[in-house]
Amino acid sequence: MSDDNSIASMAARLREAQASGRTIAPLRDTCPGGDATLAYAIQQINNDLRKTNGERVVGRKIGLTSPAVQKQLGVDQPDFGALFASMAYGDGEPMPLASLIQPKVEAEIALVLERDLTAEKHTFADLISATAYAVAAIEVVDSRIRDWDIRFFDTVADNASSALFVLGSRPVLLRDIDLTACAMTLAQDGEVLSRGNGAACLGNPLNAAAWLADRMVRLGTPLRAGDVVLTGALGPMVAVKAAGTYAAHIDGLGSVRATFTE
């Protein structure tokens, strides 16, 4: 099941799930032979519709970079999705739970670019030169797939299970920090629920960023100055069960908060 009508139908199912707040069965059940190319085609349909409706892409997220998260979801490789301006919230700004379906939070290191990344193969030096600063971030992930019963095909099609994100307010130059050594804690109202470090993100968040930069060049849509790159989770995701504040602290980058309201 890989013709244009089938792809459009699966994309429409995801849009309807988001609009209604009702999850759907895994897309892989509809398309058992679906591969990454097909999944990204589904993602692109919905992202293009958002842009047609006036939404603005402000960067990319990398998913499935932490072995802990890969283990949770039964996958073994990264993926990526688009970040839109409408997904961005300020540090501690209230996020209505009603706009989400089955949200989870994860702590990440975000990069904000000041130069385009257009090389065929990017080095750490390329990334350091092109990055204005790094900052602590919380990504709110969500799935339109029932009970988070996802595999690689499902999450890629679903814009890498993206929802919202929050950037911290303490920018740090990459040359001033060792990202692999950054310890992370993620707590809800003071109770630590997740721990990790920069090395949990493909060994170094810059490995994830280089993977994304290379991939986007191959696709003809390179990362540009001003883009935000969420490099991936530093530890296990935490399910958001009710209203409250989740605070991530990353050594050297400070803290950032995601606050959920009923």
UniProtKB/Swiss-Prot annotation:
GO terms for molecular function: 2-oxopent-4-enoate hydratase activity; manganese ion binding. Disulfide bonds: none annotated. The keyword Lyase applies. GO terms for biological process: 3-phenylpropionate catabolic process. The keyword Nucleotide-binding does not apply. It comes from the Bacteria. Pathway: Aromatic compound metabolism; 3-phenylpropanoate degradation. It catalyses: (S)-4-hydroxy-2-oxopentanoate = (2Z)-2-hydroxypenta-2,4-dienoate + H2O. Keywords: Aromatic hydrocarbons catabolism, Lyase. GO terms for cellular component: cytoplasm. Its EC number is 4.2.1.80. Belongs to the hydratase/decarboxylase family. MhpD subfamily. PANTHER family: 2-KETO-4-PENTENOATE HYDRATASE, ACID HYDRATASE. This is 2-keto-4-pentenoate hydratase. It comes from Burkholderia vietnamiensis (strain G4 / LMG 22486). The gene is mhpD.
